[in-house]
Amino acid sequence: MTATTSKRKKYVREMKPTWWKKLDFYKLYIAREATAIPTLWFCLVLLYGVISLGSLDSFGNFISFLKNPIVIILNIITLGAMLLNTVTYYVMTPKVLNIIVKNERINPNIITMALWAVTAFISLVILVFMYV
């Protein structure tokens, strides 16, 4: 079997490292994808908290760890990242969710408001049960 080689030069599109800085859409995309880093931080803190529930001494250390100003700042950054992730998810969902009722597509604002209503309701229920 013989292999034929082409004398044509392959087209390779140049991809610069700053491709995402051209459009605001790309910047938001990168910011949304970067929320994985604060999510990892939150998961590690949560894991540390669950492990420290084993004894009172380690749980006391966990509480003092949470009171550290650096940890508080990192948790505030994590909260902001999760809010960004939630907002972009709720804006994107009606665009990809195609619900048709009586041969008409549902208004995207209704879906977005329903998502926020469910979020508010669940948050309220958690807050009520936390203090009861």
Swiss-Prot record:
Localisation per UniProt entry: Cell inner membrane
Name of this chain's protein: Fumarate reductase subunit C
Record's keyword terms, sorted: Cell inner membrane, Cell membrane, Membrane, Transmembrane, Transmembrane helix
Top-level lineage group: Bacteria
Residue intervals passing through the bilayer: 36-56, 70-90, 110-130
Family: Belongs to the FrdC family.
Pfam family, one: Fumarate_red_C
Organism lineage: Bacteria, Pseudomonadati, Pseudomonadota, Gammaproteobacteria, Pasteurellales
Major place of residence: membrane
GO cellular component, one term: fumarate reductase complex
Originating species: Pasteurella multocida (strain Pm70)
Membrane topology: Multi-pass membrane protein
Single annotated GO MF: succinate dehydrogenase activity
Annotated NCBIfam families: PRK04987.1 (NF003445)
Function: Anchors the catalytic components of the fumarate reductase complex to the cell membrane, binds quinones.
InterPro entries found in the cross-reference section: Fumarate_red_C, SQR/QFR_C/D
Quaternary structure annotation from Swiss-Prot or TrEMBL: Part of an enzyme complex containing four subunits: a flavoprotein (FrdA), an iron-sulfur protein (FrdB), and two hydrophobic anchor proteins (FrdC and FrdD).
